[in-house]
Amino acid sequence: MNDPTIAIEIETTSSTKRVGLLGVLTLLAITAAAILHVNQPEFILDRFEGISELEYSLFDTTLYSSYLIIGITTGLLSDRWAKRRVFVLVGATGSILFYWLMTTTLSYPILLLYRFLQGSFTVMAWQTFMTLAIDFSESHNRGRNMGIFGAFLALAMGLGPAVGGVIASFGVFIPYYTAMGLNVLVLTIGLVALRDPPMTKTRPTLKQSFMLARTSPELIVPGIFNLFDRLHIGFILTALPFFLSTMLGLDESLRGLSLAIFALPFIILQYPMGKLSDRYGRFRQLVVGSIGYGVVLSVVGIVGLLGFNLLLVMLAILGLFSGVTSPPAMALIGDIVGQEDSAMGMGFFNFLGNLGITIGPILFGVIMPILGMSNAFVVVGLLELATLVVNILLVRTVFKDRIT
C-alpha cells in the first residue's frame, strides 16, 4: 500500500500548491516595485528642481544597489537562522512604510535614502519567496516548480509598467499608494497562509560561488552575458521613460504601454527559446540574439525621434532579441557546472546580473549629458556588440570545445 510513486505524486501536488502561493506573492511584490518606473520623470523632475541627469539616474541605481547588498545579506541570515517567514513579514511591512515615506519628503538625498530602504525591504521579501520555492522542491519536481515561479515573476515584470502607466494618470503618488496596497496583501497572505518549511536548504555563500568560478572558469561566459544584459535592462528602465517624457512629451499611460511592449516578447519567448537552445545549442543562439539586440538598441534613440509608432516596433523587436538570449545564458550554467553545483553557479550568475542592473542607470546619467539621448542608446548598443566579441574570442580560444 505504501506505493512510493503515489507518495511522490501527493508531495508534488502539495509542493506545487505552495510554489503557486509563492508565485502569487511574488507577482504582488514585484508588480508593486515595477509600477513606479513609468512616472519617474513627474515624481522626480517635477518635485525637485535642478536635478541633473546623473542625479535622476541615482533613483534607480540606489534601488538596485540595495538589491545587490541586501539580497546577499538576506540569504546568509535566513540560512543561518533557518527562518524564512519572518523575512517576508518584515520585508512587506518595511516596503509599505517606505513606499509611503517617499511621497512625503521634499529633500532629494532623503528620497534616495528612503529608496534604498524600500529596495532593501522589497528584496528581503521576494528573494525569500525564491528561496522558499527551492525549499519546497525536490529533484523530481524542481524544474516544474521553477517554471511556475518564473512565470509569475515574468508576468509581474511585464504587468507592472502597463498598470503603472494607467494608474499614474490619476496622480503622481497613486503608483506609490498602490504599491503600499499590494504589500498589505503580501503581509496579510503571509500572516495567514505562509509557514516555514520543516527543513530549510542552505544556499551557497557568495564566496563559495566565486570559488566555483575558479574551478569552472567557463562560467565567465554566461556571467558576462548576464552582466551586460541586466546592465541594459537597468539602462532602459531609467532612460526610456525619461526619453518618452522629455523628448516625445508622452504621458504616463503611453510610457507604460511602451515598457509593456518591450517586456511582452521577452515573457512569451522564455519557454520556447529554452527548448530551442536544448536542441541547437546555447552559444549560437546567444550570438544571434546579442547581435540583434545590440544593433536594435543602437538605433532605438534615433528611430524614436521619427515617431512613436516606429519606436514601438523597435521596442517589440528589442524585447524579442532579449527573449532569445536570456534562457540559453541561464541554461549554460547548468551545462557547465552540473546539477550538484547549480546553486553556486546561479549565485555567481545572479551576482553579476545584479551588478549590471546597478551600473545601467549610472551609465545613462553619465553618458546622456555628454553625448545626448540618442547617442546614449548607440553607446550601450555598441557595448553589447563589443562584449559579444569578447565572449566569441573566449569560446573559440580559451574555452574551445567546452561551450557549445
Spans of model-derived segments:
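Structural signature of the two symmetry-related core transmembrane helices
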Residues: V86-W100, R284-V299
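Juxtamembrane intracellular "pre-TM" segments in multi-pass secondary transporters
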Residues: N2-T16, R195-F225
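Symmetry-related core transmembrane helices of the 12-TM Major Facilitator Superfamily/SLC fold
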Residues: P175-L191, F377-I392
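Helix-loop boundary and gating motifs at the non-cytosolic
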Residues: T13-Y64, V221, R230-L248
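Interfacial helix-cap and linker-helix signal at transmembrane-aqueous boundaries
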Residues: I44-L45, L77-S78, V163-S169, L244-S245, ...
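Paired small-residue
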Residues: P109-L117, N309-I317
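Helix-to-loop junctions at the C-terminal end of transmembrane segments
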Residues: I70-A82, Q270-G281, M368
